[in-house]
C-alpha cells in the first residue's frame, strides 16, 4: 500500500510529478489499479471462504467491506489456531464438529473411492487406449471373481464377450485407433457413455485367460465410461488418453410376474366351446382350476341390473369384432380376491366350413383391482384379426388359425405383445408355446407368434383334436354358460401350448392362415421343421413321450405340468388325418399338434371323449389332482414305453424333443412322431412310476391311459411297436374300440366265459374291436436279465389281442400285473422265460384253444409253447373241459398256463404284456424262447438268496411286494410236515406220501408229507371212477386212480401254469363240458404229447378284449376282496377249529364247512359229473389234477401234484366245500383229489379229471366270498371234483399251472369269481414254493372250475382260513401256518384273469414245484426251488409264475 502512495501521493515531490509528466502518472495509476483489483480479488476469495462458514453467512450476505472481510479472516485464522491447540491438548471429539467446513473433507481420499464404488454397486477400472486395464478396483473379485492382480495390465478384451468387443472399442476409442494414435485435438472434451456388456466370470478351474470358451459364463454388466482424452499425470506416471469405467451388475429387471391369463373360445352364440388354461398351468400356480371357474363365473354373472360382461362383450364383439371388459372381481376358495378383465375378438377361420368363433383372453390381475382392460391385454388379445368376411364359416380351430392369416409378422407382433404382457401371455403362452406368458418358459418372442396362433390353436385344437367333438356341445350356451363347462380346465395342461415356448418365430409359417386345419395353424406356428418345439400339443407329445421328455421345450414347467399335459390321454390324440388337411408336413405337424392340444386341453385332466374342456365335467380340485397324478403316472408309464417303441419305430426323425413333433406322419406323426426319445425312461424309473401308479392310480386310469395310446396308435398310423413297450403301446386300438369296448367287453367276457371252447375256437377272433398288437416278439432275454433287458431279438409276430381297454378289475392285481407287465413288456423275454421254464417248454399250445383272455395272458407263453411244438402234451387233460373240451384244450395250454402261472405270467396276463408276449410264430423263435427260458431258470436257480434278492431289488420286485402289489408266492408253506391226513371218512387210503418233488417217481414222495394220499375211495361220497383215460376220454367219469406211481415228472411251474391257464380257459370255455380225462403221457412230462385235438385247441384264440379282461379283473378284485374277508373269517374260524379241524376228516364238516357257507353251493358243477362223481368214496375220480395231464406219468405227476393238491387244494377244497359239500363230498374231494392225484397213477390220470378234479372247470357259481365263495357244486361231485382237481392241479405243477395258466379266459364271471382261489398247497416240501408260483398261475382266474375256486379258500395261507374239513384237514395247520409264514412270499395272488385271482398257497407244494423232473419241461429252476425256494428271489418266483 505504501508503494502505491509513494510515488503518487508524496506531497513533497510535486515537482517530480510534473517532471515525469503524464506518462509516469499513467503508469503509476495503472499499476495501482491492478493492485487494487488484485486486492479485491483476494478479498472476494476470502469472503467466499468465510461465507462457507455458516456463522459468516449473515455477515457476508451483503457485499462486505474490505475491513470486515479482513477482520473476519483474522478471526477465522485465530479460531483455527485456537482449535488446533485445543485439539492437540484435549482431543475432544465434540470439538471435531466445530471444525470449519473449509478444512479438508472429513472423508479421506483413500476411503472415499471404496465408498463411492460401494455406493455404485460396481467396480472401477481404467482402460488405456490400447485396451489394457491399467487399473481395476479390488472389489472386482466380488463381481467377476478375478483378483485385482489378475486383471491389471491384461487386455480388457480377455474378460469381454466377443460380441461386445466392438461396442467397447467404440466407447473406448471413439476417435482414436487402438494403436495409441494421439487423440484428435477436437476430442479434448470428456465423453461419457453407458452401455451393457458381458463380462467373463472367472472360471472356477483356471484364472481368467483370453480363451475361456470352455467355461464361458458371462455376467451382463452395465458400464459407465468416461473418456479422458488428455493425458493425466499422477505419481509421476503419464496416463495417456484412457477410458475410465465403472461396471455394475445390470439391475435385474423386476421379476415379471407372468400375467395370469387363460383363454376361452366361444361359438357365435356365446357358448364356451373350449377353455385353454395352458398359460395358467404353465405358470405353475396351484388353484388355477378354481381361478378359472371363479373367473368365468364372475365373467358370466350379471352386473347388478346390467347384463354380464360376457353378454356385453359378446354383443360388442359380434358388432365390432373386438371388445374388452372392465375389471371385475372374484374371490377364490381360499379367500383371495382377484380382479380380471377380458378381451374378446371375433375370429374367422380360414376354412369356409368352420364357423367364426370368439376368442376371449381373461387376464387375471392379482395386484391391482385389474389391469385396465386396455393394457397389454390388448396386444394379447390382438390376435391378428381376420376380416370377419374371411371364411366366417371357418371352424373355430381354423379360427385359431385365422389369426395366422395375419401376416406372420403381425401374429408375431401380437403374440409377442401378448407374451410380453402377461395377460396376452395367456394367449401367447397358450398359443405361442406360452413362451412368454410362461415367462420363464423361454419362448422367444418369435414363438409368441405361435402364441397368437396358439390362441387360435387353443380353439383350433379343441376343434381339431376331434372334429367330432362338438365344441358347441358345451352346455354353456350364451352367457348362460354354466361354470361347469369351463370348470374342467382339465389338465389341458398346455394343451401343448405352454409347452411349446421354444418355437422359433420363424417356425410359424409366414402365412399361418394358410394352415387349413385348425390344428395346422398351431402346428404351423410350432412348425416342426423348426425343430423348435412343435406346437404339437405338448401334452400329446408328452403323453406320448411322457418319459423324460417334458414334451415341452419349457422345462420350466414342473414335471407335473408336463405330466398334466401328457395327461391328456394319448388316446385323445386320435388325430384324424382327415381333419388335418396338412398342406405340408409342417402344417400336418402343426395340425397334429393343435389337435393334440385340443384333445389335451379339452380332456387334459380326464380323457374326455369330447375332449373339450367345456364339458360340464368339472374336475373337482381333488379329482383333478388325483387324475393328474394318476393320469400322469399312467400316461408316463404308457407313453414312455409307448413313446420309446414308437420312437424307435418312427425312427423318431425328430431327435429333438422340440422337433419331436415334426417328421411324424400327419396324424400319426403327432402320436408317434410326437413321442420323443426322451420319453424313454429307465426301467427303474418306470418301476418307480408303476409303484406310484399302483399306489395312486386306479385300474381304470391305467386302462384308459393304456387304451388311449393304443387308440392314438390306431388312429394315427398303426405303429408296429418294436417291443417292450407296454402292451398298450403295442396295441393298435381302432378308434371306435373305446366306444364298443365297454359293452363289448362285457359281452365278450360273458361270451367267452359261457362259450364252449369249440365255439371259441370257431370264433377265435372276438369282435372286440380287436386291438391288433403288432408285437415284435422279443426273444427271451437271458433268464438272468434282471434289468429290464431291452427286448431280445423281437421275432415280429403279430397277434391280435383284444384291446384290453380297461382293466378296472382287481386294481391290486392289476397293479401287481402292471409293474410286472411293465417289466414283462420291457423284458418280455424275461417274463416269457420265466413262464417257459416252469412249463412244458416244448408244449405246443394253440392259442385258439385258450379263451381270448387266456390267450392274451398266455399269448406269449403259448407262443412259446407253440414254438416248442416238440413238446406235445398228449397227456393234456381237459381237466376243466367237458369231454369235448378236454380235447380242445391240450395241456399245452395248461402248460402255457403253468408258464403264465409264474408271477411274470400272471402279471403278463395284463393285456399289455400279453400283447407284448405274442408267441413266436417260428420254431426257431420257440426254441429260442425255450432256451432263454431255460437259461433264465438255470441262471436264477444258480443264484443264491442274496443274489436273487439283489435281482429282485434291481427289478423293483421287492418294492412291489412290499407295496402289496404282489404277494410273492414264496413257498408259503414250508415243506409241510405230514399233516395229519385229512381223513376223508371213507378214505381209508389217504396218501400219506407227501408230494414227491417233481421227481418223476410214480410214487409221489411226500414232499407233502403231511398230505396223505387218499385212496380213490372218497369218504362217504362215492366218486365215479373213470378209467384212466389214455386220451381225453370224453367221459369225465373219474375212476379213482390207483395210486399209480407215475414218475412225477417234475411239473414245470410254467407247465402247471400253462395247464392251469389252459384249464381255466377250458373251464371257461367248457365249463359245462365234463372234464375229459386225458391220460397224461405216462412218462416224461415234457414228453407229454398234446393230442392233435388238443393242439388244435391250442390254436390261438382271440385274446379277450381288454375290457373283458378289465371286467374280469374287476370281478376278480371284488372276489378277491370277498375272498380276503372270507379267508380272514375262515382263518379265524379255522384257527379256532384248526386244533381239531386239521385232524378231522374232510367229511367231518370241519371249518371246511365254513368255507362252504361262504361258497355258494347252489350251482351244481357245470361238469356233467354227478354230484357224487368225484365224491364216490370208493373211486376217487381219476386224478383230476391238471398236472396229471401234463405229467407223462399221470400218477407220478399226479402223485406230486395230487399230494400237493390233495393236501393243499383238497384240504382247502374240503374246507371250502366241506360245509356246502357233504362231509362225504369233502372227503371225496380229498380222497378224490388225493386219489385222483395219487390213485390215478394212470397216465390218463390227468385227463380223467373227475368232477372232483380241481382242474376240472367247475361251473360252480362264483362263491360269494371270492375265495370261499366258490360254491361247491350241489353235487358232491363238484366239490370233490374241484378238490380233486385242485389237488391235482396243485399236485401237478402242470395241473396247477394249468389252472393258473388257464388264463382267465373269460369264463363265467361266477366261475372266475369262484376261480379266485387261494390255493394253499399243503405239502411237506418247501418245494411248494415252486408250486406256489404255479399255484399263483393256478389262480384259476381262467379256470372255470368253481371247485378250483373253492380250493382257493383252502389255499388261504392261514390254515385257519382254509377249510380244514377237507384238504385243510389234510394239511396240518402247522403246515399251513408254516406255509403261510414261509409263503408270505409264497402266496401270491396272481390275477390270472382280471376276474379271477388265485392266491395259491402251495403247502408242501415245493416237492411238486421242485420236482426235479419238470413236467417234462419244468426247468430245474422249479426243481431247485426248495424250502429255500421260499427264500428264492421274488424275481425267480415271478419268473416261475
From Swiss-Prot:
Motif LXXLL motif 1 covers 46-50
Question: Motif (LXXLL motif 2) spans which residues?
Answer: 112-116
Glycyl lysine isopeptide (Lys-Gly) (interchain with G-Cter in SUMO2) crosslink residues = 846
Comp. bias intervals (Basic and acidic residues):
83-96, 615-624
Under the GO molecular function aspect, what terms does this record hold? chromatin binding; histone acetyltransferase activity; nuclear estrogen receptor binding; nuclear receptor binding; nuclear retinoid X receptor binding; protein dimerization activity; protein-containing complex binding; RNA polymerase II transcription regulatory region sequence-specific DNA binding
Positions occupied by motif LXXLL motif 3: 633-637
Region Interaction with STAT3: what ranges? Answer: 361-567
Where does it reside? Nucleus
Question: Which residues are reported to carry the modification Phosphoserine?
Answer: 22, 372, 395, 517, 558, 569, 698, 1033, 1185, 1372
The family database entries (InterPro entries) matched by this protein are listed as:
bHLH_dom, bHLH_NCOA1-3, HLH_DNA-bd_sf, NCO_DUF1518, NCOA1_bHLH, Nuc_rcpt_coact, Nuc_rcpt_coact_Ncoa-typ, Nuc_rcpt_coact_Ncoa_int_sf
Keywords assigned by UniProt, alphabetized: Acetylation, Activator, Acyltransferase, Chromosomal rearrangement, Isopeptide bond, Methylation, Nucleus, Phosphoprotein, Proto-oncogene, Repeat, Transcription, Transcription regulation, Transferase, Ubl conjugation
Instruction: Indicate the disease this protein is implicated in.
Output: A chromosomal aberration involving NCOA1 is a cause of rhabdomyosarcoma. Translocation t(2;2)(q35;p23) with PAX3 generates the NCOA1-PAX3 oncogene consisting of the N-terminus part of PAX3 and the C-terminus part of NCOA1. The fusion protein acts as a transcriptional activator. Rhabdomyosarcoma is the most common soft tissue carcinoma in childhood, representing 5-8% of all malignancies in children.
Q: How does it assemble?
A: Interacts with PPARA; the interaction is direct. Interacts with PPARG; the interaction is direct. Interacts with ESRRG; the interaction is direct. Interacts with STAT5A (via FDL motif). Interacts with STAT5B (via FDL motif). Interacts with STAT6 (via LXXLL motif). Interacts (via LXXLL 1, 2 and 3 motifs) with RORC (via AF-2 motif). Interacts with ASXL1. Interacts with the methyltransferase CARM1. Interacts with COPS5. Interacts with the histone acetyltransferase CREBBP. Interacts with DDX5. Interacts with the histone acetyltransferase EP300. Interacts with ESR1. Interacts with GCCR.
What's this protein's name? Nuclear receptor coactivator 1
Amino acid at each position: 500500500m505504501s508503494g502505491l502512495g509513494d510515488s503518487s501521493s508524496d506531497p513533497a515531490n510535486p515537482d517530480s510529478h510534473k517532471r515525469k509528466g503524464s506518462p509516469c502518472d499513467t503508469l503509476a495509476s495503472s499499476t495501482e489499479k491492478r493492485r487494487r483489483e488484485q486486492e479485491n480479488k483476494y478479498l472476494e476469495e476470502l469472503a467466499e471462504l468465510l461465507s462457507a462458514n455458516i456463522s459468516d453467512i449473515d455477515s457476508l450476505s451483503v457485499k462486505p467491506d474490505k475491513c470486515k472481510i479482513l477482520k473476519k479472516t483474522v478471526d477465522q485464522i485465530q479460531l483455527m489456531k485456537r482449535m488446533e491447540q485445543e485439539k492437540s491438548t484435549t482431543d475432544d471429539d465434540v470439538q471435531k464438529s466445530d471444525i470449519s467446513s473449509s478444512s479438508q473433507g472429513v472423508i479421506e481420499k483413500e476411503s472415499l473411492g471404496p465408498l463411492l464404488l460401494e455406493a455404485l454397486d460396481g467396480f472401477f477400472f481404467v482402460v488405456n487406449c490400447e485396451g489394457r486395464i491399467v487399473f481395476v478396483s479390488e472389489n472386482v473379485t466380488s463381481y467377476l471373481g478375478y483378483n485385482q492382480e489378475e486383471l491389471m495390465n491384461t487386455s480388457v478384451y480377455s474378460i469381454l464377450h466377443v460380441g461386445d468387443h466392438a461396442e467397447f472399442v467404440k466407447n473406448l476409442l471413439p476417435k482414436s485407433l487402438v494403436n495409441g494414435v494421439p487423440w484428435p485435438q477436437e476430442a479434448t472434451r470428456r465423453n461419457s457413455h453407458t452401455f451393457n456388456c458381458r463380462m467373463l466370470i472367472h472360471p472356477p478351474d483356471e484364472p481368467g485367460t483370453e480363451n475361456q470358451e470352455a467355461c464361458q459364463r458371462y455376467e451382463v454388466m452395465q458400464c459407465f465410461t468416461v473418456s479422458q482424452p488428455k493425458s493425466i499425470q499422477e505419481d509421476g506416471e503419464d496416463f495417456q488418453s484412457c477410458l475410465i469405467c465403472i461396471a455394475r451388475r445390470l439391475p435385474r429387471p423386476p421379476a415379471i410376474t407372468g400375467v395370469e391369463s387363460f383363454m376361452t373360445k366361444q361359438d357365435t352364440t356365446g357358448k364356451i366351446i373350449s377353455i385353454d388354461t395352458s398359460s395358467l398351468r404353465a405358470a405353475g400356480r396351484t388353484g388355477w382350476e378354481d381361478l378359472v371357474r371363479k373367473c368365468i363365473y364372475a365373467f358370466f354373472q350379471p352386473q347388478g341390473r346390467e347384463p354380464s360382461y360376457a353378454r356385453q362383450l359378446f354383443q360388442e364383439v359380434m358388432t365390432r369384432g373386438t371388445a374388452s371388459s372392465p375389471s371385475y372381481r372374484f374371490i377364490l376358495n381360499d379367500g383371495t380376491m382377484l380382479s380380471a378383465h377380458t378381451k374378446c375378438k371375433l375370429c374367422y377361420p380360414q376354412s369356409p366350413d368352420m364357423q367364426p368363433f370368439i376368442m376371449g383372453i381373461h387376464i387375471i390381475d392379482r395386484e391391482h383391482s385389474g389391469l385396465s382392460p386396455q393394457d397389454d391385454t390388448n396386444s394379447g388379445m390382438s390376435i391378428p384379426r381376420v376380416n370377419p368376411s374371411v371364411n366366417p364359416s371357418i371352424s373355430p380351430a381354423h379360427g385359431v388359425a385365422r389369426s395366422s392369416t395375419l401376416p406372420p409378422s403381425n401374429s408375431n407382433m401380437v403374440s409377442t405383445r401378448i407374451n410380453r404382457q402377461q395377460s396376452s401371455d395367456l394367449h401367447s403362452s397358450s398359443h405361442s408355446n406360452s413362451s412368454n406368458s410362461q415367462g420363464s418358459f423361454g419362448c422367444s418372442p418369435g414363438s409368441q407368434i405361435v402364441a397368437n396362433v396358439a390362441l387360435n390353436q387353443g380353439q383350433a385344437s379343441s376343434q381339431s383334436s376331434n372334429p367330432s367333438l362338438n365344441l358347441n356341445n358345451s352346455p354353456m350356451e350364451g352367457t348362460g354358460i354354466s361354470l361347469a363347462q369351463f370348470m374342467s380346465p382339465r389338465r389341458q395342461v398346455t394343451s401343448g401350448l405352454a409347452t411349446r415356448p421354444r418355437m422359433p418365430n420363424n417356425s410359424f409359417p409366414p402365412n399361418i392362415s394358410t394352415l387349413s386345419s385348425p390344428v395346422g395353424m398351431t402346428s404351423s406356428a410350432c412348425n416342426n421343421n423348426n425343430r423348435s418345439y412343435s406346437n404339437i400339443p405338448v401334452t400329446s407329445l408328452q403323453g406320448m413321450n411322457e418319459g423324460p421328455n417334458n414334451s415341452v421345450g419349457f422345462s420350466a414347467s414342473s414335471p407335473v405340468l408336463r405330466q398334466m399335459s401328457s395327461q391328456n390321454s394319448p388316446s385323445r390324440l386320435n388325430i384324424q388325418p382327415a381333419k388335418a388337411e396338412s398342406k405340408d408336413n409342417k402344417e400336418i405337424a402343426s395340425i397334429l399338434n393343435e389337435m393334440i392340444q385340443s384333445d389335451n386341453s379339452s380332456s387334459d385332466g380326464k380323457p374326455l371323449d369330447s375332449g373339450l374342456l367345456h364339458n360340464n365335467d368339472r374336475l373337482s380340485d381333488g379329482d383333478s389332482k388325483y387324475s393328474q397324478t394318476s393320469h400322469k403316472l399312467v400316461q408316463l408309464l404308457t407313453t414312455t414305453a409307448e413313446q420309446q417303441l414308437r420312437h424307435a419305430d418312427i425312427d423318431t426323425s425328430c431327435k429333438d424333443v422340440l422337433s419331436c413333433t415334426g417328421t411324424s406322419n400327419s396324424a400319426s406323426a403327432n402320436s408317434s412322431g410326437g413321442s420323443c426319445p426322451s420319453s424313454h425312461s429307465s426301467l427303474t424309473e418306470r418301476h418307480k412310476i408303476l409303484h406310484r401308479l399302483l399306489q395312486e392310480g386306479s385300474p381304470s386310469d391305467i386302462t384308459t391311459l393304456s387304451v388311449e395310446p393304443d387308440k392314438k396308435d390306431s388312429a394315427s398310423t398303426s405303429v408296429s411297436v418294436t417291443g417292450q413297450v407296454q402292451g398298450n403301446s403295442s396295441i393298435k386300438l381302432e378308434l371306435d374300440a373305446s366306444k364298443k369296448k365297454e359293452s363289448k367287453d362285457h359281452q365278450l367276457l360273458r361270451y367267452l366265459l359261457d362259450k364252449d371252447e369249440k365255439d371259441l375256437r370257431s370264433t377265435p377272433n372276438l369282435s372286440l374291436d380287436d386291438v391288433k398288437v403288432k408285437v415284435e416278439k422279443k426273444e427271451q432275454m437271458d433268464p438272468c436279465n434282471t434289468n429290464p433287458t431291452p427286448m431280445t431279438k423281437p421275432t415280429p409276430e403279430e397277434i391280435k389281442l383284444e384291446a384290453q381297454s380297461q382293466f378296472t378289475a382287481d386294481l391290486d392285481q392289476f397293479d401287481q400285473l402292471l409293474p410286472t407287465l411293465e417289466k414283462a413288456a420291457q423284458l418280455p423275454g424275461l417274463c416269457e422265460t420265466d413262464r417257459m421254464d416252469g412249463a412244458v417248454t416244448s408244449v405246443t399250445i394253440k392259442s385258439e384253444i385258450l379263451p381270448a383272455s387266456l390267450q392274451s395272458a398266455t399269448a406269449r407263453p403259448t407262443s412259446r409253447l407253440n414254438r416248442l411244438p416238440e413238446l406235445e402234451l398228449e397227456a393234456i387233460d381237459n381237466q376243466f373241459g367237458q369231454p369235448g373240451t378236454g380235447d380242445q384244450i391240450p395241456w399245452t395250454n395248461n402248460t402255457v398256463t403253468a408258464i403264465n402261472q409264474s408271477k411274470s405270467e400272471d402279471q403278463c396276463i395284463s393285456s399289455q404284456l400279453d400283447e407284448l408276449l405274442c408267441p413266436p410264430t417260428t420254431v426257431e423263435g420257440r426254441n429260442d424262447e425255450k432256451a432263454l427260458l431255460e437259461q433264465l431258470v438255470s441262471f436264477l436257480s444258480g443264484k443264491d438268496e442274496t443274489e436273487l434278492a439283489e435281482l429282485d431289488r434291481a427289478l423293483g420286485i421287492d418294492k412291489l411286494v412290499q407295496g402289496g402289489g404282489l404277494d410273492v408266492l414264496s413257498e408259503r408253506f414250508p415243506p409241510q410236515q405230514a399233516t395229519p391226513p385229512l381223513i376223508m371218512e371213507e378214505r381209508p387210503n389217504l396218501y400219506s406220501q407227501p408230494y414227491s418233488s417233481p421227481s418223476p417217481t410214480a410214487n409221489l414222495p411226500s414232499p407233502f408229507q403231511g398230505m396223505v394220499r387218499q385212496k380213490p375211495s372218497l369218504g362217504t361220497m362215492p366218486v365215479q371212477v373213470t378209467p384212466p383215460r389214455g386220451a381225453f376220454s370224453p367221459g369225465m367219469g373219474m375212476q379213482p386212480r390207483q395210486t399209480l406211481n407215475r414218475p412225477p415228472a417234475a411239473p414245470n411251474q410254467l407247465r402247471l401254469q400253462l395247464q392251469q391257464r389252459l384249464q381255466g380257459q377250458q373251464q371257461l370255455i367248457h365249463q359245462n363240458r365234463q372234464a375229459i380225462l386225458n391220460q397224461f403221457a405216462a412218462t416224461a412230462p415234457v414228453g407229454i404229447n398234446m393230442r392233435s385235438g388238443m393242439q388244435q385247441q391250442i390254436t390261438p384264440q382271440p385274446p379277450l378284449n381288454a375290457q373283458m379282461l378289465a371286467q374280469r379283473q374287476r370281478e376278480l378284485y371284488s372276489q378277491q376282496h370277498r375272498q380276503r374277508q372270507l379267508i380272514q373269517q375262515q382263518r379265524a374260524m379255522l384257527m379256532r377249529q384248526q386244533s381239531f379241524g386239521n385232524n378231522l376228516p374232510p367229511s367231518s364238516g370241519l371249518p371246511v364247512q365254513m368255507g362252504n357257507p361262504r361258497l355258494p353251493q347252489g350251482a351244481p358243477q357245470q361238469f356233467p359229473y354227478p354230484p357224487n362223481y368225484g365224491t364216490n368214496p370208493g373211486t376217487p375220480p381219476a386224478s383230476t389234477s391238471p398236472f396229471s395231464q401234463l405229467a407223462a406219468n399221470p400218477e407220478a405227476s399226479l402223485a406230486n401234484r395230487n399230494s400237493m393238491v390233495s393236501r393243499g387244494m383238497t384240504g382247502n377244497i374240503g374246507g371250502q366245500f366241506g360245509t356246502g359239500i357233504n362231509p362225504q363230498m369233502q372227503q371225496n374231494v380229498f380222497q378224490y383229489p388225493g386219489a385222483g392225484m395219487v390213485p390215478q397213477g394212470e397216465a390218463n390220470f390227468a385227463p380223467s379229471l373227475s368232477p372232483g378234479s380241481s382242474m376240472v372247470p367247475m361251473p360252480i357259481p362264483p362263491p360269494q366270498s371270492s375265495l370261499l365263495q366258490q360254491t361247491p357244486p350241489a353235487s358232491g361231485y363238484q366239490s370233490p371234483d374241484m378238490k380233486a382237481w385242485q389237488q391235482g392241479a396243485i399236485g401237478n405243477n402242470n395241473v396247477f399251472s394249468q389252472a393258473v395258466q388257464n388264463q382267465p379266459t373269460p369264463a363265467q364271471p361266477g366261475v372266475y369269481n369262484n376261480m379266485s382261489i387261494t390255493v394253499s398247497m399243503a405239502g411237506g416240501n418247501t418245494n411248494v414254493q415252486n408250486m406256489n408260483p404255479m399255484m399263483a398261475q393256478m389262480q384259476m382266474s381262467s379256470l372255470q372250475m368253481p371247485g378250483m375256486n373253492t380250493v382257493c379258500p383252502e389255499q388261504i395261507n392261514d390254515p385257519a382260513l382254509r377249510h380244514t374239513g377237507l384238504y385243510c384237514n389234510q394239511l396240518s395247520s402247522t403246515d399251513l401256518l408254516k406255509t403261510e409264514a414261509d409263503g408270505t412270499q409264497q402266496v401270491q395272488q396272481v390275477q390270472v384273469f382280471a376276474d379271477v385271482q388265485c392266491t395259491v398257497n402251495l403247502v408242501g407244494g415245493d416237492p411238486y414245484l421242485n420236482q426235479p423232473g419238470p413236467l417234462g419241461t419244468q426247468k430245474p429252476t422249479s426243481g431247485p426251488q426248495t424250502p429255500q425256494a421260499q427264500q428264492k428271489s421274488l424275481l425267480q418266483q415271478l419268473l416261475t409264475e
